[in-house]
Amino acid sequence: FIMAFIFACSLCVTNSSCNDKKMDGADSLASDSTLVDTTAADSTDEIIAETPMPKAADELFDDFIFNFAANKKLQMKRICFPLPVYKNGKLTKEIEKGKWKMEHFFMRQGYYTLIFDNKAQIKLVKDTTISHVVVEKIFFKIKTVQQFVFDRKNGEWMLTAIEYKPIFRNMNASFLKFYEKFSRDSLFQINSMAEEVKFTTPDPDDDFSSITGNMMPEQWPDFKPGLIPTGTLYNIIYGQKYSESTRKVFMVRGIANGLEIEMVFRRRSGKWLLTEFSC
């Protein structure tokens, strides 16, 4: 199956704020953050496992990873066993096929997150020529990033390695340190805003239109996106090159549930500030 995203959010308050659907990630080294009944999820997995992945799903990495994360049979076929596991660049072990545990990534939480240096990099999501992608699982509590390395071999995406690195060595380290506090501290959110923040939200009177304006920091509780992920985050590196930039685009994308949130942060005088957002 191929997932599709719909650029829309529902409204929850009368002053055109974003929706208030709350979904928090769990901070654990478990293979997934299970936010649904596991029995029902296992039954769904069995059904999906019997559904072959369309060949076209290897064209776009997003289409592949959704299938890979939901289809156990496919996942086992698309891993290069024994799978090497590295820590700080050194090989620590190799996982044999019989020892592998199903990795659902972000599928059961209903959304995933992306980090870009600029909006132009977002186009890489639809690039069918890329052959190397890294899915990052970011654990704030233990200050570690788990990287799943995928390479396209003979036209098929394969998981070729897993790497563990400390957050401080990540190319987004400065932003991640800031975002970890921003995501869980409402007062810090207000204090981490530009004097005016540009926003775009759905028009409550027209399902096909949006409203764009500016808000003051003290208005944030009424206008903020309904979901600001915390706990364990994900990031997909499609080939975007990160730098010590003064701008980060943080995106939240729903999995077949219509959710899409975009927040733009800029670093001014060493301090990250939210400058615009849309949902």
What are these regions (language model features)?
Residues 136, 140-170, 258-279:
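Short beta-strand edge/turn micro-motifs at domain boundaries
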Residues 13-17:
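C-terminal motif of bacterial Sec signal peptides marking the signal peptidase cleavage site
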Residues 19-21:
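Bacterial signal peptide processing site
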Residues 154-192, 199-210:
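Surface-exposed beta-loop interaction hotspot
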Residues 56-73, 172-188:
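Short, aromatic-enriched amphipathic alpha-helices that serve as compact interaction elements
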Residues 31-66:
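N-terminal low-complexity, Pro/Thr/Ser-rich intrinsically disordered segments
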Residues 85-142, 203, 209-259:
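Surface-exposed, charged secondary-structure patches
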